[in-house]
Amino acid sequence: MGDLPPYPERPAQQPPGRRTSQASQRRHSRDQAQALAADPEERQQIPPDAQRNAPGWSQRGSLSQQENLLMPQVFQAEEARLGGMEYPSVNTGFPSEFQPQPYSDESRMQVAELTTSLMLQRLQQGQSSLFQQLDPTFQEPPVNPLGQFNLYQTDQFSEGAQHGPYIRDDPALQFLPSELGFPHYSAQVPEPEPLELAVQNAKAYLLQTSINCDLSLYEHLVNLLTKILNQRPEDPLSVLESLNRTTQWEWFHPKLDTLRDDPEMQPTYKMAEKQKALFTRSGGGTEGEQEMEEEVGETPVPNIMETAFYFEQAGVGLSSDESFRIFLAMKQLVEQQPIHTCRFWGKILGIKRSYLVAEVEFREGEEEAEEEEVEEMTEGGEVMEAHGEEEGEEDEEKAVDIVPKSVWKPPPVIPKEESRSGANKYLYFVCNEPGLPWTRLPHVTPAQIVNARKIKKFFTGYLDTPVVSYPPFPGNEANYLRAQIARISAATQVSPLGFYQFSEEEGDEEEEGGAGRDSYEENPDFEGIPVLELVDSMANWVHHTQHILPQGRCTWVNPLQKTEEEEDLGEEEEKADEGPEEVEQEVGPPLLTPLSEDAEIMHLAPWTTRLSCSLCPQYSVAVVRSNLWPGAYAYASGKKFENIYIGWGHKYSPESFNPALPAPIQQEYPSGPEIMEMSDPTVEEEQALKAAQEQALGATEEEEEGEEEEEGEETDD
């Protein structure tokens, strides 16, 4: 037959992609051939007859000689149909009838007819090897001496063709891998287990870097766990959050070997340290038990948690945590001060800090001692002022030019109300947060109340802050806060009708209109008012705090009425300046006046009532809200009621606030000759004036001499 010819060159028109796919198909055919090769030991166990009939690598040409001669032409026809490639004729040393001929449409039809007839013949004989080729288990293609030169088998690229086993590309490799001593190799890569795959995916997710920095969550967790294992804290879970913050802080602050300042304590931590004292009891053992027994009895500390519960139903009030801390703070206040009654008045909001207000009443005799100390301080100041005035008068006497005294007299100072009466009936303590020290507010004066009505200022939360306003306010923020508390209390402290009543002794001393009554007492026969009646009519609610007059007091005083000392000192002045001393007396509404008599605010009702829950009125509470002072609320349920204020301390005004205008301009000093300006004289006028003065002086001297001579003559006679 001769030597095998060299491999034919590939056609020039074949695209690169086709060459790449064909090369990969050849590599894949080698791998599949190696993977599907049978083990020699297993082949030895099969009987010889079974080995001849079984489909395997040992079988060689199962087609007839005529079929083998026609198969290369079929492959070339299929190759030409798919890719349009034509192969050059190759001289294999066989006769011309066995040489591969160029493929054409006529030859295609002939080959198809011949193949069909051969397949039908084989099917009739029952010896067809077509089913053996379709068998997927280790079927070897037949040996074709002419087809071995066709390196590009088209059946490898068809969709329905089974891949492998294939003829080896290397003619020198004529043995199976198992025959050469290589172990059995499977071409399929084993897939990882689901758990291992999930772990790999989770780790890849944790290794993603953050947007803000180049670190990943995996690295952060490694650093965090390393710190915990190195430090070995007693309770790792409790310090996990702080360690996490420290680890994050170290990302942006590298460790330094120099001295650093200690971190400042956070305000929240400071406040928590101060509030620790509220949750501790002084003493222990039997002493603590005795104190507990004493506290179980009567105590001036109110039940703030019960009040907070009712106001919570009304939709107002503070949180339960803050209410409980306020309760403990007021308990601390009662232990520090001689308090007879105590009540949580409310909370006034501020720009920087807020005020918690406690309304208290001291025991009898305790407040007088403190007032005496305050009076001594004020008297000392007055003495210093008087001494300064005396020194000023002496300086004025020594002065050459005496300034004329002003005729204007300041308006008389209205005295403040005494303790336990009027606007100063109760004492007020304030603090910014529960646990901080309580500060007592001073008594309010009428001038402070009058000026507080003319200004509107936000509170800062610091009592010593000056109040910058016009008209000027006489005091600092502590005095302004006290004045606003007095105004709010007088207008919003209400109670159900019949809860309070006047005593019988005051009934005999009642003045006209009942304006002189300033005290009341609880009615023991009060049974409560149904909730629906409290909501329907405002006449079932009354004011139990005295009204503040325009003068700034609850009880009116005559500002022109003087004491005996003032009358003795100024009798002569009064005679010179006699004027009308009669001033119209101011009268306000009496105590326990119904809310239905309150004046409207620009056609707006001053009060609004509602039920806490309209779906279940039998278990609801009546709630009344002030429209004049937003933030003032009151509730009533049976024999219980309470008032509270939570707001900015400002009165509602339908119009925008306008500050007071400056005072009217005073009259100028009357013009007269003593203040008239004169024109300067000329030189001639000065000389003429001088000559006239000398002449007048000479005339006076002559007259004096003549008078002296006449007197001498009379004496001689």
UniProtKB/Swiss-Prot annotation:
Phosphorylated by PKA. Phosphorylation increases in capacitated sperm. One of its GO terms (biological process) is manchette disassembly. It comes from the Eukaryota. It is found in: Cytoplasm, Cytoskeleton, Flagellum axoneme. Keywords: Cell projection, Cilium, Cytoplasm, Cytoskeleton, Flagellum. One of its GO terms (cellular component) is axoneme. Component of the axonemal radial spoke 1 (RS1) and 2 (RS2) complexes, at least composed of spoke head proteins RSPH1, RSPH3, RSPH9 and the cilia-specific component RSPH4A or sperm-specific component RSPH6A, spoke stalk proteins RSPH14, DNAJB13, DYDC1, ROPN1L and NME5, and the RS1 complex-specific anchor protein IQUB. Interacts with RSPH1. Interacts with RSPH3B. Interacts with RSPH4A. Interacts with RSPH9. Interacts with RSPH10B. Functions as part of radial spoke complexes in the axoneme of sperm flagella that play an important part in motility. The triple radial spokes (RS1, RS2 and RS3) are required to modulate beating of the sperm flagellum. This is Radial spoke head protein 6 homolog A. It comes from Homo sapiens. The gene is RSPH6A.
